[in-house]
């Protein structure tokens, strides 16, 4: 933040000096003013550190950040900002302007640059020359068509979007996949048959790739021209052609020069590592291959968000993103396929009632009976709902005569009066909890998927009567708590009335399909997967994951680095880990 402010102030200082003198800024004056500005900045920083002013500034940072953002965005540099650059007189020399502007073409920030660097360090200089050469020629040809306004080529090519982008992804995929299986041996000859493919692929990708940095830096130029594509307009056609050809020649010469510079720099870095470290050549080659492979793959995927695929598919049909005509279709973020139909005979309506609120168009932290928006602290749905349904996760030890179970029940707020599980008095006894306990006592260890229809036919009438009596007692004796009732009525038991047999059946069905078993009587156990049953299959799956470079890299970054940075006092002992596991099961 302070760096942006210093740069803006420095530009204003140079602009003020230029306006005051009325003449082009001389080189000596530029250096003296720059040194004076740097000394003033250093003096200000030292005074702030010694006077402890930085403590006050840090405390006021939440207030200052919006004001700083507004000042940076709101204050545009004056017109004289572009005048002092004319001291170099680059605007009159298109060759030098093109040469310097080509530095942005050679920045190694695109997928093709990473692939070419990989070929340089693994397969040698000839392979890198052909790779970089095809990319540079493709860029220069594209820029020439833009500068000269060759509409017969540019307009039809751009109207093919996104087909040309998809073609670029296909070409990049072929190159990246081939990198995975290519030999890392150095190619010393200049007439290898692979070089032709290297050149052609890079030439085509220069017209298709969207991951290069120069598209997004087109307004950065060392000359007075507003963009890198700004031409040199003259009334004389011959002079105009000469200037444009000179500018393109400067682009070509600069691209080759800066590319050779980057190649020389990477080769020097490789030589330095070989001489001054204990790494062998094959280790460096393997590391470079992995880094370039991941970088090229990352940049290729990074271009995907620039295209909305739902719009690409329905755009030609006349639709727009977030169109109401696309609601409840596969093109909406809230689309969900219908659930299984095995239990649909119990209900007239679908049993899966899921509320999906996509983050781009949902309303959050509200519920139907209130209009004002509540804070996150007031609506902790997950924790509150887990506390409401905690009775379903009790094990037999909690409800039996075991000493540990009684202590745990007392700590959680349950006071056991009798030996029966159904006679527990809950801290907040509600209609839903009573009904769940009633079902729990009847269907403890039965698989509801096979027997729920027969059970409902025989027990529904008595259950409805008992629940109605319990409901009247609940409404008459207990206080109303909207915070907890919100979960019964809005999330889990919405529009449920115990006076209607049809809705009672819906209630039982919706309650029973929430888990694999109806109200399990033990702690949540770790599910057995295929790898635990068949050890050979599990070992093979683990080996496949461990062979994946992306998986191992993410695992190292996410877990190993995090644990390595933790202080020793933050590590858990054996007793603490055991206690944490018990609390998680609760």
UniProtKB/Swiss-Prot annotation:
Residue intervals passing through the bilayer: 95-115, 129-151, 155-177, 198-217, 247-267, 284-304
Main location: plastid
Subcellular location: Plastid membrane
Keyword Transmembrane helix among record annotations: yes
Keywords: Membrane, Plastid, Transmembrane, Transmembrane helix
Membrane topology: Multi-pass membrane protein
Keyword Endoplasmic reticulum part of the UniProt annotation: no
One Gene Ontology cellular component: plastid membrane
Assigned protein family: Belongs to the ycf78 family.
Protein name: Uncharacterized membrane protein ycf78
Species of provenance: Prototheca wickerhamii
Encoding gene (name): ycf78
């Amino acid at each position: 933040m302070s760096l942006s402010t210093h740069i803006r102030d420095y530009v204003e200082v140079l602009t003020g000096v230029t306006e005051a003198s009325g003449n082009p800024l001389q080189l000596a004056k530029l250096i003296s003013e720059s040194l004076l500005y740097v000394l003033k900045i250093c003096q200000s920083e030292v005074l702030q550190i010694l006077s402890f002013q930085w403590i006050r500034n840090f405390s006021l940072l939440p207030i200052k950040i919006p004001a700083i953002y507004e000042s940076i965005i709101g204050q545009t540099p004056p017109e004289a900002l572009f005048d002092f650059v004319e001291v170099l007189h680059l605007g009159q020399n298109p060759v030098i302007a093109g040469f310097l502007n080509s530095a942005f073409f050679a920045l190694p920030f695109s997928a093709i640059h990473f692939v070419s660097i990989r070929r340089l360090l693994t397969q040698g200089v000839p392979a890198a020359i052909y790779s970089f050469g095809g990319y540079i020629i493709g860029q220069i040809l594209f820029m020439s068509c833009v500068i000269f306004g060759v509409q017969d080529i540019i307009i039809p090519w751009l109207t093919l979007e996104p087909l040309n982008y998809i073609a670029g992804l296909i070409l990049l995929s072929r190159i990246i996949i081939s990198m995975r299986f290519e030999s890392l041996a150095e190619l010393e000859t200049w007439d290898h048959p692979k070089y032709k493919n290297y050149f052609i692929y890079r030439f085509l990708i220069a017209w298709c790739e969207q991951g290069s940095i120069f598209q997004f830096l087109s307004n950065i130029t060392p000359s007075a021209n507003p963009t890198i594509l700004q031409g040199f307009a003259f009334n004389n056609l011959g002079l105009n052609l000469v200037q444009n050809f000179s500018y393109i020649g400067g682009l070509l010469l600069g691209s080759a020069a800066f590319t050779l510079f980057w190649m020389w720099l990477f080769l020097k870095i490789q030589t330095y590592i070989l001489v001054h470290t204990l790494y062998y050549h094959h280790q460096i080659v393997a590391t470079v291959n992995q880094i370039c492979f991941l970088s090229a793959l990352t940049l290729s995927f990074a271009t995907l968000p620039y295209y909305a695929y739902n719009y690409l598919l329905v755009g030609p049909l006349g639709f727009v993103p977030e169109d109401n005509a696309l609601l409840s279709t596969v093109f909406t973020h809230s689309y969900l396929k219908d659930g299984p139909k095995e239990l649909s005979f119990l209900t007239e309506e679908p049993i899966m009632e899921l509320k999906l609120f996509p983050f781009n168009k949902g309303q959050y932290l509200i519920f139907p009976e209130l209009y004002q928006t509540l804070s996150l602290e007031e609506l902790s749905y997950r924790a509150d709902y887990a506390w409401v349904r905690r009775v379903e996760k009790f094990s037999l030890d909690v409800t039996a005569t075991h000493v540990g179970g009684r202590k745990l029940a007392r700590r959680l707020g349950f006071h056991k009066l009798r030996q029966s599980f159904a006679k527990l008095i809950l801290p907040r006894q509600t209609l839903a909890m009573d009904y769940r306990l009633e079902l729990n006592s009847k269907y403890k260890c039965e698989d509801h998927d096979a027997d729920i229809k027969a059970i409902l036919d025989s027990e529904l009438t008595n259950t409805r009567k008992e629940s109605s009596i319990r409901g009247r007692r609940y409404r008459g004796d207990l206080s109303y708590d909207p915070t907890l009732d919100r979960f019964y009525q809005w999330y889990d038991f919405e529009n449920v009335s115990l006076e209607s047999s049809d809705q009672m059946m819906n209630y039982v069905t919706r309650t029973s399909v929430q888990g694999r078993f109806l109200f399990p009587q033990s702690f949540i156990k770790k599910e057995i997967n295929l790898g635990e049953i068949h050890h050979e299959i599990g070992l093979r799956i683990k080996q496949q994951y461990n062979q994946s470079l992306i998986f191992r890299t993410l695992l190292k970054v996410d877990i190993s680095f995090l644990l390595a940075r933790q202080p020793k006092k933050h590590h858990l002992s054996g007793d603490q880990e055991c206690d944490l596991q018990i609390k998680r099961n609760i």
